[in-house]
């Protein structure tokens, strides 16, 4: 199995931080993703963030669902 890269870890940490900052749980994220047409299950969200394995498109979908308009790296 491939090891998690620093870039994957950074992407996952950014998304987790934005969820925490907005006070959004994984369950709420699933609901918000559904509202923008993204069908996802809570267990899948948890696994993606835990592994850091998701696409840039998924990151953007999540950030949009959370309501993030600006991101500082």
Please give the residue ranges for each predicted region.
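A short, Lys/Arg-rich alpha-helix, primarily the initiator
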Residues: 1-25, 31-32
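Amphipathic alpha-helical interface segments used for dimerization/assembly
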Residues: 19, 26, 62-66
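Residues within the alpha-helical elements of helix-turn-helix
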Residues: 32, 36, 65
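Recognition helix of helix-turn-helix/homeodomain-like DNA-binding domains
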Residues: 35-53
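DNA major-groove recognition helix of helix-turn-helix/homeodomain DNA-binding modules
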Residues: 55-73
């Amino acid at each position: 199995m491939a090891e998690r890269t620093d870039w994957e870890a950074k992407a996952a940490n950014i998304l987790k931080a934005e969820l925490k900052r907005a006070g959004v749980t994984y369950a709420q994220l699933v609901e918000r993703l559904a509202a923008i047409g993204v069908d996802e299950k809570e267990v899948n969200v948890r696994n993606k963030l835990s592994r850091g394995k998701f696409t840039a498109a998924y990151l953007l979908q999540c950030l949009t669902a959370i309501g993030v308009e600006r991101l500082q790296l």
